Curated annotation (Swiss-Prot):
Residues spanning the membrane: 220-240
GO biological process: cellular response to water deprivation; negative regulation of stomatal opening; protein ubiquitination
Record localization: Membrane
Associated pathway: Protein modification; protein ubiquitination
Organism: Arabidopsis thaliana
Region entry Disordered, spans: 168-197
Enzyme class: transferase
InterPro entries in alphabetical order: Ub_conjugating_enzyme (IPR050113), UBQ-conjugat_E2_core (IPR000608), UBQ-conjugating_enzyme/RWD (IPR016135)
Protein name: Probable ubiquitin-conjugating enzyme E2 33
Lineage, highest ranks first: Eukaryota, Viridiplantae, Streptophyta, Embryophyta, Tracheophyta
Reactions listed under catalytic activity: S-ubiquitinyl-[E1 ubiquitin-activating enzyme]-L-cysteine + [E2 ubiquitin-conjugating enzyme]-L-cysteine = [E1 ubiquitin-activating enzyme]-L-cysteine + S-ubiquitinyl-[E2 ubiquitin-conjugating enzyme]-L-cysteine
An example Gene Ontology molecular-function term: ubiquitin conjugating enzyme activity
Basic and acidic residues compositional bias, start-end: 184-197
Keywords tagged on the record: ATP-binding, Membrane, Nucleotide-binding, Transferase, Transmembrane, Transmembrane helix, Ubl conjugation pathway
Length: 243
């Protein structure tokens, strides 16, 4: 059972977060347990975590703020082991260094900063930049599978829906562009085919024209034919004139 001072402190911190949100950090208490908070860290630009949304939990002790909370991360991220407590100076791994003045916002800001670092610690893992980027890209889809996440962070669910629509539109546009690029190739092939047929027709016509011209050249002119007919007629008429 949470102590009265603990409840009062956490309620105050939640109001402060709602009034003055912290950059790249969203945190909300569970509707059924004020000691259990759920958070989302947004990956910073210029890092392998850019574009990622990292969901996790903070479990406060009833003695908070005089004792530190436990912190875990649910989203696969390439920096911390999921569902395992993370060792931080602000977590229950180091109660001796805990400062009661630290708040939810300072805890999560510190976690985000430590996430960008590569220093090994209990609960950390070592992965490549490419792996972190891959996990960042798939983080929102992973988170939206959680019923609790969808209930506590509807704005991220809406963001994921918008991403899906945008990806579908981009895929459709890419398909249309690819098809449009194929059409000119088909049209060009058709034009080339028509040109080839046209050239064949022209070639046939030219051959026919040349043949007719050659035949005309080989045929005797009309006046020569007429002269020959006249001569033949005279020759045939000579015997008759002698009678």
């Amino acid at each position: 059972m949470a102590e009265k001072a603990c409840i009062k402190r956490l309620q105050k911190e939640y109001r402060a977060l709602c009034k003055e949100p912290v950059s790249h950090v969203v945190a909300r208490p569970s509707p059924n347990d004020i000691l259990e908070w759920h958070y989302v860290l947004e990956g910073s630009e210029g890092t392998p975590f850019a574009g990622g949304f990292y969901y996790g939990k903070i479990k406060f002790p009833p003695e908070y703020p005089y004792k530190p909370p436990g912190i875990t991360m649910t989203t696969p991220n390439g920096r911390f082991v999921t569902q395992k407590k993370i060792c931080l100076s602000m977590s229950d791994f180091h109660p001796e260094s805990w400062n009661p003045m630290w708040s939810v916002s300072s805890i999560l800001t510190g976690l985000l900063s430590f996430m960008m670092d590569n220093s090994p610690t209990t609960g950390s893992v070592n992965t490549s930049v490419a792996e972190k980027q891959r996990l960042a890209k798939s983080s929102l889809a992973f988170n939206c599978k959680s019923v609790t996440f969808r209930k506590l962070f509807p704005e991220y669910v809406e963001k994921y829906s918008q991403q899906q629509v945008a990806e579908e539109e981009a895929a459709t546009q890419q398909t249309t562009t690819s098809e449009n690029q194929d059409f000119p190739q088909k049209d060009n092939a058709k034009v080339e085919s028509e040109k080839s047929v046209g050239l064949k027709k022209e070639s046939i016509q030219e051959v026919g024209l040349k043949e007719r011209r050659r035949n005309k050249k080989e045929a005797l002119p009309g006046w020569i034919v007429l002269l020959l007919v006249s001569i033949v007629g005279v020759v045939m008429a000579l015997p008759l004139l002698q009678l």
